[in-house]
Amino acid sequence: MKINSPQFNLMHKACMKASKILIRDFGEIEKLQVSEKSPGDFVTASDKRVEKVLIGELEKSEYSFLTEETGSIDGKYKDKRWIIDPIDGTFNFLNGLPHFAISLAYEENGEI
C-alpha cells in the first residue's frame, strides 16, 4: 500500500482519533472496567471504545472487518477488509507499561 493511498489516509485518520482514547484511558487505568475473556486474556472498556471508533471511521470504505473483540463484520466488499486489534499489548496497558499499540491492517484478496 502506498503511503498516499486512500486506504492509508483513512487508516491514519482512524488511528489518530482512536489514539486519543488510549492516551486518556492510560492515564486513568485504575478506573477502567476490565473483563476476562479467557484465563489470562483480558478485554477493557478501552478496547471496546477504540474498536468502536476505528470501525466508525473505517466503515465509510464499505469494506469488511475482522476484529479481536467483535469478530467478523461483513461489508459491501468481501475481498477487502480491515483487521483490527484495538489494544495490541493489553497486559502492558493494564499494568501501566507504555508498550502497546493499535494494530490495524488492510487486506485485499487475501494479501495484507
Question: How does the language model describe each region?
Answer:
Residues 1-87:
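N-terminal subdomain of lithium-sensitive/metallo-dependent phosphomonoesterases centered on the IMPase/IPPase/PAP
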Residues 76-112:
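DPxDG-like acidic metal-binding loop motif
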